[in-house]
Amino acid sequence: MKIIIIDDDKLVCSSLKTILSSKGIHVCATGNNGAEAIKLYEQHRPDILLMDIRMETINGVDASKQILSSFPQARILFLTTFRDDEYIIKALQMGVKGYILKQNYDCILPALEAVYMGQNVFNTEIITRIPDLWRQKESFPIDNLNSREMEITIL
């Protein structure tokens, strides 16, 4: 599996690269903002782009939109500390493959493996909020969830 890590915290990038490389994952590049994410994605075409949301220059949401408009098959996994409803909704609307919280570092490797295998991955805390967000927002799109994911979300 070939990935790119994008995070404005250089220590996070470096640590993740070391940890994931030791697990056999090829980290082909790292970057610190959305502009670098776009450039590095075009250059390396990774299996997965692991990216933070709030960053300088271009944030992760805007970078993802640009990448997905040019490469609709791109597999983007957000790794963030932010649980904001706005970000969760935008992630689902644009079709990113996952949204996991940095506080749960143990789930990063399994999340990468699941996304690599074609699954969507959201932390339990995020999944449990989706039905409430859906009810609050009349136009909340769930088109990017398959029937099984929607079934699990509604439970």
Question: Language-model features: where?
Answer:
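Active-site residues of response regulator receiver
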Residues: D7, D52, T80
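Two-component/phosphorelay signaling modules centered on CheY-like receiver
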Residues: K10-A29
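Acidic catalytic/metal-coordinating carboxylates
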Residues: N33-E36, I58-D62
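Short amphipathic alpha-helix used as the core "switch/output" element in two-component signaling
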Residues: K39, V61-Q73
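Active-site beta3 strand of CheY-like receiver
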Residues: H44-L50
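Receiver (REC) domain active-site loop signature in two-component systems and cognate sites
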Residues: M55
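Short, flexible helix-to-coil linker/hinge segments that flank and couple to helix-turn-helix
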Residues: E86-L92, Q103-D143, S147-E151
